Amino acid sequence: MLLQPAPCAPSAGFPRPLAAPGAMHGSQKDTTFTKIFVGGLPYHTTDASLRKYFEGFGDIEEAVVITDRQTGKSRGYGFVTMADRAAAERACKDPNPIIDGRKANVNLAYLGAKPRSLQTGFAIGVQQLHPTLIQRTYGLTPHYIYPPAIVQPSVVIPAAPVPSLSSPYIEYTPASPAYAQYPPATYDQYPYAASPATAASFVGYSYPAAVPQALSAAAPAGTTFVQYQAPQLQPDRMQ
């Protein structure tokens, strides 16, 4: 006949099984849709005045104004727990009520604080800004369309013709009245300056080969150009 060993009593060294969450913490009520966050409160708002305001929407389980631990002054926000979800919905129907003479903001606590106005903070996205405002703020320069006379370096005449000039070419001659007041002797004091005759010999001539075809056709019919013929170089005679 076999003898069964007696059951051992649990000693202090062995861990005991954990109790059920309901037995340890009790039955905790879900306040997801009943707890309300109240922000923007004035500093003189107390728990009693906060409760008095929300009593008009239904039964209240708790109304607390958060205060600073060191100074004991209000931090400007609090929490109100309503008895049921319907009362919380009625309390949040007005998102910006007047509490104790100041405009506050009310929303469910799990959703967080709601902004007072859509124009504050970063409520406006960058995509909604006007393009001109983005260019001024972020330094984005607009695209410019340059005229052909600026893009092409070979063109020597501006894109828009000057009304005061009859010809697109400006000829500087020694007989010009603007330069007649300067005597030729004034150029002799600079050893490396070109004489007026030498400068006039290069300025007064034009080269039709370098003029584009479009500009040559746009010139007036009465305008004539002086053809410059380069001197023929003769080889040195052998002696």
Curated annotation (Swiss-Prot):
One GO biological process term is: regulation of myotube differentiation
Principal localization? cytoplasm
| One GO molecular-function entry | mRNA binding
- Cell location: Cytoplasm, Cytosol; Nucleus
User: InterPro entries from the entry?
Assistant: Nucleotide-bd_a/b_plait_sf, RBD_domain_sf, RNA-binding_reg, RRM_dom
Please provide one cellular component term from the Gene Ontology annotations of this protein: cytosol
Q: Tell me which Pfam families the record gives.
A: RRM_1
RRM domain residues are: 34-111
User: What factors induce this protein?
Assistant: By p53/TP53 family. Directly induced by p53/TP53, TP63/p63 and TP73/p73.
Alphabetical UniProt keywords: Cell cycle, Cytoplasm, Differentiation, Host-virus interaction, mRNA processing, mRNA splicing, Nucleus, RNA-binding
**Biological function:** RNA-binding protein that specifically bind the 3'-UTR of CDKN1A transcripts, leading to maintain the stability of CDKN1A transcripts, thereby acting as a mediator of the p53/TP53 family to regulate CDKN1A. CDKN1A is a cyclin-dependent kinase inhibitor transcriptionally regulated by the p53/TP53 family to induce cell cycle arrest. Isoform 1, but not isoform 2, has the ability to induce cell cycle arrest in G1 and maintain the stability of CDKN1A transcripts induced by p53/TP53. Also acts as a mRNA splicing factor. (Microbial infection) Essential factor for the splicing of the pre-mRNAs of human parvovirus B19 (B19V) and for the expression of B19V 11-kDa protein, which enhances viral replication.
Q: What family is reported? A: Belongs to the RBM38 family.
Record's protein name: RNA-binding protein 38
Instruction: Cite the source lineage.
Output: Eukaryota, Metazoa, Chordata, Craniata, Vertebrata
